[in-house]
Every structure is written in structure tokens, then in C-alpha cells.
């Protein structure tokens, strides 16, 4: 999984998961977009990137809070 994620991040221009402290900081930013929460434009690697992202419980909690 991590190898796939690294290949995705190195070879493709995708959006990847921010550190949870950045995510928390963005919770007060009305211009927040989900684009920064998940990988996008990674082709077949999107699912691997998302799985890596949401493995972090704090990050997941932030994502859920953003959905309201």
C-alpha cells in the first residue's frame, strides 16, 4: 500500500493527504475543499491513496466534521 502511494505521489500530479494539524487548522477556513482530503487524478492509485489517508483516525474525524 505504501509503495503504491509513493508511486502515486512521485509519478503523478495528485492531491495527497495533509498532516492532521493542517486539516484541523482548515476547519475554520470557509474556503476549505475536499480536494485536499483525498487523492485526485491518480488513475488506478486513487483507492490506495484514500485508504492511506483515512487510516489516520484523527484525520478521519476531521473529515467527518467537515461533512457536518
UniProtKB/Swiss-Prot annotation:
The modification Lysine amide is found at residue 67. Keywords: Amidation, Disulfide bond, Secreted, Signal, Toxin. Disulfide bonds join 23-53, 39-49, 42-62. GO terms for cellular component: extracellular region. Residues 1-17 form the signal peptide. Expressed by the venom gland. GO terms for molecular function: toxin activity. It is found in: Secreted. It comes from the Eukaryota. Comprises exclusively 4 tightly packed alpha helices (no beta strand is present). Belongs to the helical arthropod-neuropeptide-derived (HAND) family. Toxin that paralyzes insects. May have a direct effect on the insect central nervous system. Arose via modification of ancestral neuropeptide hormones (ion transport peptide/crustacean hyperglycemic hormones (ITP/CHH)). This is U1-agatoxin-Ta1c. It comes from Eratigena agrestis (Hobo spider).
Amino acid at each position: 500500500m505504501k509503495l503504491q502511494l509513493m508511486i502515486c505521489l512521485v509519478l503523478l500530479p495528485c492531491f495527497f493527504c495533509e498532516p492532521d494539524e493542517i486539516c484541523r487548522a482548515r476547519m475554520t477556513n470557509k474556503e476549505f475543499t475536499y480536494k485536499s482530503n483525498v487523492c485526485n487524478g491518480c488513475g488506478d492509485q486513487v483507492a490506495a491513496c484514500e485508504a492511506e489517508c483515512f487510516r489516520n483516525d484523527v484525520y478521519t474525524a476531521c473529515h467527518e466534521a467537515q461533512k457536518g
